[in-house]
Amino acid sequence: VLEKIYQILKRNRTIIFVNTRAQAELLFISITKKYKDLKFAIHHGSLSKKIRLETEENMRNNQINAIISTSSLEMGIDWDTISQIINIGTPKGVNRLVQRIGRSNHKYYSVPKAVIVPTNKLEYFECQACINLIKKKKYDLIDEKIGSNDVLCQHLLILSCMYGFESKSLFKEIIKTHPYKNLKYSYFLEIVSFVFDGGYILNNYNKWTKLKKDNRNIYRVNDENNKRNIIMNIGTIIDNSNIRVTLGKKILGDVDQNFLNFIKKGDCFSFSGISVECINISADEIRVKKIKKKTLNVPVYWGGNLSLTKSLTNEILKIFEHNQFENYPSKLQNFVKNQEDKSTLPKQNLVLIESFPYKLGSYLVIYTFRGRQANQTISNLLTRTLIDNGYSPLNYILNDYSLGIFINSKVRDLEG
């Protein structure tokens, strides 16, 4: 696969899109190790702003041949120097893939060009499903968002720090916005009560009282300490603590705090496209030095997986149901035939469940085609249920399409 990618890169200035930051680092290591005649760069959200801007400037000035990037280059990049997009796998949805493809040939009368590279057999069908949906112009539906309580709470707190608010007039203003158009006044008053003193559960504790109400029924923040805390903590995004990575005086970027659990002084890892050795660790910083030795150890980031969209899932299952694989590569035809001989192909509105013996136990495999996050939740619930029913699940594995649980029981015991 790398050789085919290399042949494309020799003819085209390219952005290679991947789905995770760890995948970007690993691909950069592999491709730069093998092909030294081309200039590559890496781009993702955990690199420092300075490094990202330098990379963008180099690509704009034709100083590099390809950037390996996550979704950090999906939006707002209008370079006419990019003639080709390569996407490793799919970004788990049609809309995002179309957006990525649109980064190429960004000039009048030009046609965007892209190559999709599946990384396994099932992902081949996912890539084909994406292409089918794009040809039919069937894009992912964007769900209507209902206004979130935490956003509304923060809005009330911020208003209280400014000129205050009166509940009835503010309610009339809020329901004019689309996300809160169905908000009931009684529920809105519960939100106000919660912001005022913690609501009916916490109103007996003074520390939760943040607002005061004057004789004109105007709510305002009750003291300067609360005002300062509110202003300093504006925002609703859950922030995972990050640790800064520095090379000398240069900040390379950030890694998740949990990376500290897997690294110690003297360990080597790859970050920002270079191999480094850890020389010092503190509570908020990992200091490193550059080394020549290549290493495949890379930081893994919390929340890095994209969710498989419903429309793409349904299109994959339609491909299996139509069962027309004559034009597919022989390896894919053999893969499908082997599945049909031993079991059956997954179908829409049905969940395929398989079990088979393995060593002293057996595997229970469930094909959900609902994405990694859904399969993670199902695995946790099913593991708990099996334990409650006297079984001994030892481990589970999962991907976007299925989950497998290894159980310390024979298949006949499970069926019984």
Where do the protein language model's features map onto the residues?
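Short glycine/proline-enriched turns and hinge-like loops at secondary-structure junctions
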Residues: 78-80, 110, 280-282, 377-378
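Flexible loop/turn segments at secondary-structure boundaries
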Residues: 24, 49-50, 75-76, 94-95, ...
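Gly/lys/ser-thr-rich phosphate-binding loops in alpha/beta enzymes
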Residues: 74-75, 83-85, 104, 262-285, ...
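Terminal, basic amphipathic appendages of nucleotide-handling enzymes
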Residues: 136, 148, 240, 281-351, ...
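C-terminal accessory/connector segments of nucleic-acid motor ATPases
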Residues: 139-264, 268-269, 275, 281, ...
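Helicase motor core with emphasis on the C-terminal RecA-like subdomain
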Residues: 1-216, 220
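Short secondary-structure boundary/capping segments
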Residues: 83-84, 101, 295, 382, ...
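An acidic- and aromatic-residue-enriched active-site/binding cleft used to recognize and process polar
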Residues: 19, 45, 72-73, 80-82, ...
